């Protein structure tokens, strides 16, 4: 980012905004390529199991970025995992205890509010965030950058629905 700031330092404000927007679009394309080749359910379980290791105790934010659809995250091998099926597995009880979990995937939280609360209760997550509709990659990247920063900067924050803000 430093080289970006130097290269646009003397340009007009509008030009800077366009340049930054283009930089976000390029970065989002790179992220999109990574997401497309990301994981299978087996890979997902491998990394989720690591959360039980003491060396991960300090991590209080779990950011899960996949393709998504109603109530599910989708893997590169064209399979999907229903959130409630994940939460209801005995080995996942309390898996996110005290942590904030963000699903950076389209429509994953398009489910009944009671089910989201049950997911939170079963996994013991502190907070669950994500999308109830399909979102474009650039907008979601910008929003998630803000969200991660807000969570990181504010220990005493409280969650609200975007519609309530």
Give each language-model segment a name.
Residues 1-61, 80-82, 96-98, 102-104, ...:
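A domain-level signal for caspase-like cysteine endopeptidase catalytic cores
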Residues 78-141:
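Catalytic cores of nucleophile-dependent amide-cleaving enzymes
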Residues 153-165:
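A conserved mid-domain beta-alpha-beta active-site/ligand-binding segment of alpha/beta enzyme cores
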Residues 9-14, 68-72, 107-111, 134-136:
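Short acidic, S/G/P-rich loop/turn micro-motifs used as interaction or catalytic elements
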Residues 60-74, 127:
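Active-site microenvironments of hydrolase-like enzyme catalytic domains
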Residues 49, 141-148:
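Short, surface-exposed amphipathic charged segments that create phosphate/polyanion-binding patches used
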């Amino acid at each position: 980012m430093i080289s970006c700031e130097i290269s646009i330092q003397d340009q007009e404000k509008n030009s800077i905004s366009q340049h930054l927007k283009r930089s976000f679009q390029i970065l989002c394309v790179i992220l999109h390529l990574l997401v497309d080749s990301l994981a299978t359910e087996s890979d997902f379980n491998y990394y989720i199991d690591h959360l039980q290791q003491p060396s991960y105790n300090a991590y209080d934010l779990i950011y899960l970025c996949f393709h998504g659809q109603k109530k599910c995250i989708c893997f590169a091998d064209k399979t999907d995992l229903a959130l409630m099926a994940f939460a209801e597995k005995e080995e996942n009880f309390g898996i996110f205890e005290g942590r904030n979990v963000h699903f950076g995937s389209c429509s994953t939280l398009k489910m009944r509010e009671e089910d989201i609360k049950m997911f939170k209760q079963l996994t013991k997550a502190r907070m669950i965030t994500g999308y109830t509709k399909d979102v474009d990659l650039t907008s979601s990247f910008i929003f998630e950058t803000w969200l991660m920063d807000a969570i990181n900067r504010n220990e005493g924050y409280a969650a609200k629905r975007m519609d309530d803000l």
